[in-house]
Amino acid sequence: MMEFVYPHTHLVAGVDEVGRGPLVGAVVTAAVILDPAKPIVGLNDSKKLSEKRRLALFDEIKEKALCWSLGRAEPHEIDELNILHATMLAMQRAVAGLSIVPEFVLIDGNRCPSLPMPSQAVVKGDSRVAEISAASILAKVTRDAEMATLDLAFPHYGFAQHKGYPTAVHLQKLQEHGATEHHRRSFGPVKRALGLASN
């Protein structure tokens, strides 16, 4: 993988999302501007880190970053817009929530939302760009905590384990118990569980 070449500017925000694939809950995004004077060791793609390491980095990022912000799109917005457009909206919200306006925004993936400043999509950015890695960690820890809370409210589904992704266990529980109000009704397995799918 080629080393990423940063844009010639100072205030660079990294943006990433977590939760495009799950059948339940919001898609959560984060935007982070790191402080060059306060480097954070060990930033890497959140999916490659242990949960313990993610939690430690979560606190360190919030403490050391120049600024950070979370964004989200709720299940009803995902159902209305589709998952791609809802993700773009959540990314826009994360960037808009930053207390410092970035001069440039780096987005994980291959597509950028419409933003009021220059931006660039970076494929595999969560493992190539520190700001995107930091955003990935903030988004994942936040969404995982939301799934743990949802698990307490709906203990039959196993949300704390599968985080809402369409695992065999989740699909089985969906058949047994039906969908919660937090499920994404536009997603095929949820439609089928609700009897809304057109065969």
From Swiss-Prot:
Q: What class of enzyme is it?
A: hydrolase
- Catalysis: reaction(s): Endonucleolytic cleavage to 5'-phosphomonoester
The terms describing its cellular component in GO are: cytoplasm; ribonuclease H2 complex
Q: Where in the cell is it found?
A: Cytoplasm
Cofactor comment text:
Manganese or magnesium. Binds 1 divalent metal ion per monomer in the absence of substrate. May bind a second metal ion after substrate binding.
One GO MF term, please? RNA-DNA hybrid ribonuclease activity
> What SUPFAM superfamilies does the annotation carry?
Ribonuclease H-like
Domain RNase H type-2, chain residue ranges per copy: 10-199
UniProt-listed InterPro entries? RNase_HII, RNase_HII/HIII, RNase_HII/HIII_dom, RNaseH-like_sf, RNaseH_sf
EC number, UniProt record? 3.1.26.4
Q: Which cofactor does it need?
A: Mn(2+); Mg(2+)
Which UniProt keywords are given for this protein, alphabetically ordered? Cytoplasm, Endonuclease, Hydrolase, Manganese, Metal-binding, Nuclease
Please give the Gene3D superfamilies that the UniProt record associates with this protein.
Answer: Ribonuclease H-like superfamily/Ribonuclease H
Report residues binding a divalent metal cation.
D16, E17, D108
Record GO biological process = DNA replication, removal of RNA primer; mismatch repair
Q: Which HAMAP family match?
A: RNase_HII_B
Its function, per the record, reads:
Endonuclease that specifically degrades the RNA of RNA-DNA hybrids.
The UniProt similarity line reads: Belongs to the RNase HII family.
Name of the protein this chain belongs to: Ribonuclease HII
Name the source organism. Klebsiella pneumoniae subsp. pneumoniae (strain ATCC 700721 / MGH 78578)
Q: Which gene encodes it?
A: rnhB
